[in-house]
């Protein structure tokens, strides 16, 4: 039995407790500074406030953000379950507390734009802060509710040390949670990060179709973006076109970063993009922008919602502009990415240039 400490008790971090507990490991679920209301509820024996599930069947304890030291003491595996906006907090406050040789499994999706104009995946950033700690990361389609409910799920674990990746798989793999392994951390992590960005792009078509029905504000956006909710205007050719363009640009981007572009056709890319478009905060973001709202209006309508897609798009587009100056990339090969950046950062209306899409 291992001690598995999960830092970040939001929905995905909390869901990871299920396979770890089912495998007989002792789980410690610890909150970030934003998670106190979750930890307070769980300590009181209540359901998880956002996952809407009981933890009665999960073996372990709950810790608040000011209880990191006892939560991490003796931990064999630590899950980085924070959002991309919490990466520096994790590096500053959690990594220094880890014993050498601890295995960190990151489920955080995103990319860092560095001062030298490079993009860095989070596991490499963490490793630069603690080279004596082992790191693995997770990519692939995994809806938190379904994992917690033991639905059949297949993902990809990656890392630059296959021994660490296989150890992570041994801790979490179950009869319902199936794990592929890869040493191409760049290919997997870039695909996993970019699918968040491009899920917004595909969702623009949802909002554009709803605009045809006269829906141009945030009415019903939460209910309409729950996975399985019917589309208000079921038009799918535009969504399919944007999905295909997303996969094309993701492959180009992953290869530009030095990863294997084939991952885009697999679990970390197209697989994860598929479920992300079905519902959740990124679908809400893209749908509202497609309805004709500006990004400023959308941020107000979705106040309190973490919009990781916006951060990834902004960083990726800026990376492409900087890479163009050095002759390493051509933003014209990423028309959907650059259009999404214009929508977010120049308040441009959602109006995809369909004739700019396509190619191989």
Q: Which ranges hold each PLM region?
A:
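Short beta-strand/turn micro-motifs composed of small residues
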Residues: 8, 31, 106-108, 139, ...
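Electropositive phosphate-/nucleotide-binding environments in soluble metabolic enzymes
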Residues: 10, 14, 36, 62-65, ...
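NAD(P)-dependent Rossmann-like dehydrogenase/reductase catalytic/cofactor-binding core
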Residues: 195, 200-206, 210, 217-234, ...
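Internal alpha-helical scaffold of NAD(P)-dependent oxidoreductase catalytic cores
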Residues: 97, 128-134, 152-262
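Rossmann-like NAD(P)(H) cofactor-binding subdomain of soluble oxidoreductases
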Residues: 62, 68-152, 168-170
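NAD(P)+-binding Rossmann beta1-loop-alpha1 motif at the extreme N-terminus of oxidoreductases
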Residues: 1-54, 60-64, 72, 93, ...
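General beta-strand structural signal in soluble alpha/beta enzymes
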Residues: 106, 134-139, 179-183, 265, ...
